Amino acid sequence: MRMDPFIMVVIALLVMSSSVVVHAKRVEFSDVSRSDDTSHIIEMIQQINESMLFSFHHGLMQFGPRYTGTASCNLASQYIYDSFQAMGLSVEFYNWKMKGFTSRNVVATLEGIDPNSTAQYILCGHYDTVKAGPGADDDGSGVAAVLAIASVLSHYQFNNTIKFITFSGEEVGTYGSFTYARDASHRGDNIIAVLNMDMIGFANTVEGGRVLRFFPPLRSRWIAEYATTIAEKYQDMLDMTVVTLPSYPGDDSQAFVDYGYDGVWIAHQDGYPYGHSANDTADHLNWTYYTKATKLMLAITAEIAQRPIDVEVMLLRPLEGYLYFFKRPVRQTSFADFWANGMRGRTFIIGGRTMASAEVFSSEPIRYVVFCVDGQFLVWDSDPPYEWRIQGWFYPLIGKHTIEVYAYTTSGKVASDEMDVIILSLSTTYK
């Protein structure tokens, strides 16, 4: 069997490389305080109830199993579209084709009111199922929660934009979220966080009835930390706790992480014995727990979408998921099936000094912007445009590396972003 020369180079570089773990946080907010006025958030939380959730959930369940590409899956997407539209939200189908599947995501948008903010937050779930079952928990629970939260938040205004998205293609390879994340990256969408609710409707222990689990990659742990703070803030009302565990690469948030965004999978704690089967039905859900989990997710979404961002930095170049050859992007890489090893969205740089550029949004003056590789300082820039030609200092960059950028304000606030790259270049600053 002949192998594509590009794939051969990729394999060689991966063999030569070692993994590097870096913790990035693209934004810094003002502190969340228990003394903040919470009356409007409490008002929103109180509007979520079991009857509302049951109504949205039953509407989705009426189509039976919703395997991607089938008529029942398409009918379910129309139901979701009509539900968003009835809320007065801007809504669209996001069509995609991949690996023999043709389907569509449903995207509803609640525009932010801050004219200086391009920030987006995504609250999502997947409406497709396996062939065998109706998917009451996996992931009818997440989709109905998205709809319930959207129905409440649509009556309020927030500084930053919220997108409510239901994906198809999750059970066949997370193809719906992959295509959306890839396209969002190429558009330059300023997505701050992706909150993916996938199986949030079950509890059969006292402890499990009070816990919602967050599975962030290291770079996105700040989301779980923020959610923990919000859970503590509304503890007396909701009796819910956030527990943080290591990430799992098979959910819809991972596609966004692969393309340089922050995201987290959110699920119940107790093991669910009916998953991926004909027994994944509504009568097996714990509706009391499910309602509390949805209320907590509303509070987290509303709090984070309203809070002003003090400083944010984005790595704009090189483009995520491209092959660069002597400083020029020559082709888009295609690793849609490589979700388990982080190859989706990976950027490859061969030869030359490719330009890295960053954009900073800040409510106060920027002191400087620092570019690093694998956690080591290489260059700083005090004036926009913030740019750097990617190269080693004394030695070439060869293999797998992480490019980081840090933006420092005059008051000491810091935001950072990162990009995983595979490089084969002999360029150095000092010969």
Predicted regions and their residues:
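Active-site-adjacent substrate-binding region
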Residues: 205-312
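Secretory targeting signatures
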Residues: 1-30, 313-318, 405, 421, ...
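Solvent-exposed loop/turn segments at secondary-structure junctions
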Residues: 66-68, 97-101, 112-116, 127-131, ...
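Acidic/histidine-rich catalytic neighborhood of metal-dependent amide-processing enzymes
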Residues: 130-222, 226, 248-249, 253
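N-terminal hydrophobic or amphipathic helices/low-complexity stretches enriched
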Residues: 24-71, 110-111
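Second-shell loop/turn segments in exported
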Residues: 39-47, 61-72, 93-97, 130-139, ...
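A non-catalytic alpha/beta surface segment that caps or lines the substrate-entry region
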Residues: 55-111, 239-240
